[in-house]
Amino acid sequence: MDARSLSGILTEVREKRPLVHHITNYVTVNDCANVTLCIGAAPVMAHAHDEVAEMVAMAGALVLNIGTLDHRQVESMLAAGHRANELNIPIILDPVGAGATRLRTETAKTLLHKLHVSVLKGNAGEIATLAGAEGKVRGVDSAGVSGDPAEFARGLAEKLGLVVAVSGATDIVTDGKRLIYVDNGHEMMGKLSGTGCMASSISGAFAAASKDYVTSTAAALASFGVAGEKAAKRCEGPASFKIALLDEIYRLTADEVAHNIKVRFA
């Protein structure tokens, strides 16, 4: 595994143009749709219980995001997730705010228990909570953890048999055996609501293109980070950064990712 093989997944996404089915929050739904389009995939935002099983059958990946949670949405997530599992369609779960309230924490645990999730992507506080470690979450943001995020991510990945991605200044991706650190990104990405959700959407597109979910997730986060670095060079603040970020994702090439990727293997 090297920079060239990671960057090549972007090319596969654009060649395959997979459909990425989202059941996500209403705060960032438009951002997630746009970033999915810009990376080269096709989004569909369908949450009605009566159609999700039918819709996910057409998709290359399913992204579940609990950012604006209610019980009807959970029922739709389970219905779509069960159908995705039947068809071997990868599921990316973003457990937004797990650790902040009992509803969010228990919902994330229920989804992990009842579905075979391929990639669990969250901030350090969310992942620590789900790993049984001490994590602090304020609203939907991590407010600190006790211990090494890489170690509790690795333990959780091994226990559940999935890939865990921990977002932060340095992203961590592990399946319990392999461990990848991704150092791409820019602090402006933390000044904008929705960048974590957008990263989950890109992870879904990459998972649809490559069944090695450690590699695909690391490539997705690195590609998003490279675009963020490029966007930060020509913005004046969060609003212009958002527009520049979408533009840079749209313009991003595999060669640019290969030349600018910052990954470490442990």
Curated annotation (Swiss-Prot):
Its cofactor is Mg(2+). Substrate binds at M45, G194. CDD domains: THZ_kinase. It is an enzyme of class 2 (transferase). This is Hydroxyethylthiazole kinase. Its EC number is 2.7.1.50. Keywords: ATP-binding, Kinase, Magnesium, Metal-binding, Nucleotide-binding, Thiamine biosynthesis, Transferase. One of its GO terms (molecular function) is hydroxyethylthiazole kinase activity. Belongs to the Thz kinase family. It comes from Methanocella arvoryzae (strain DSM 22066 / NBRC 105507 / MRE50). It catalyses: 5-(2-hydroxyethyl)-4-methylthiazole + ATP = 4-methyl-5-(2-phosphooxyethyl)-thiazole + ADP + H(+).
